[in-house]
């Protein structure tokens, strides 16, 4: 499988959310899903009284999603790339002011020696289904204490045990530091 360059999925430019299109025939602000050119786009409202709008785009067969959040006027607030359909940012995280001007670009890779691509390879080698709704990859970074982890949650097997697996990989070298196995109740 071809290695995806997640750094090319977003840019630092201002963007706008089409509020009129989202709200057309959608008074309750229900989530909308659509597929455009092999990209699944989910749009929804969030926050109190729809104070923000969120768009999550995932290409077919991609291990990454693009998360974008917009204010009530439709101007971009922030955007970043995540592991497929989750919150943990990888690469650059772009933050924008109320006028849509870029205010910060945070490097989410700082402190991690083990790359997102290496985590994906680890999952493939360990038969973890990256495209299952039961699988998610999160990240934890405590820069003050220099603690960095990837947290992989999936439904499956680990060393002869089956259930919900929660695996903590060292963010520096990728070694599993802790693995929890919970009965899935199946």
Located regions from the model:
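Periodic aromatic/glycine/histidine/acidic cluster detector
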Residues: 1-85, 89-95, 101-108, 115-142, ...
């Amino acid at each position: 499988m071809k290695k995806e360059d997640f750094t090319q999925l977003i840019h630092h430019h201002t963007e706008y959310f089409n509020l009129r299109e989202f709200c057309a025939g959608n008074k309750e602000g229900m989530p909308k899903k659509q597929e455009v050119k092999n990209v699944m786009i989910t749009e929804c409202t969030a926050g109190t009284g729809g104070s923000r709008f969120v768009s999550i785009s995932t290409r077919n067969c991609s291990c990454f999603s693009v998360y974008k959040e917009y204010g009530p006027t439709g101007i971009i607030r922030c955007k970043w790339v995540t592991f497929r359909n989750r919150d943990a940012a990888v690469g650059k995280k772009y933050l924008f002011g109320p006028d849509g001007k870029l205010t910060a670009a945070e490097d989410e890779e700082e402190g991690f020696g083990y790359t997102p691509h290496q985590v994906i390879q680890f999952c493939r080698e360990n038969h973890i289904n990256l495209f299952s709704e039961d699988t998610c990859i999160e990240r934890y970074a405590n820069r003050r204490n220099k603690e960095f982890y990837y947290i992989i949650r999936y439904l499956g097997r680990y060393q002869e045990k089956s259930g919900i697996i929660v695996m903590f990989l060292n963010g520096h070298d990728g070694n599993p530091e802790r693995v929890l196995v919970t009965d899935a109740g199946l």
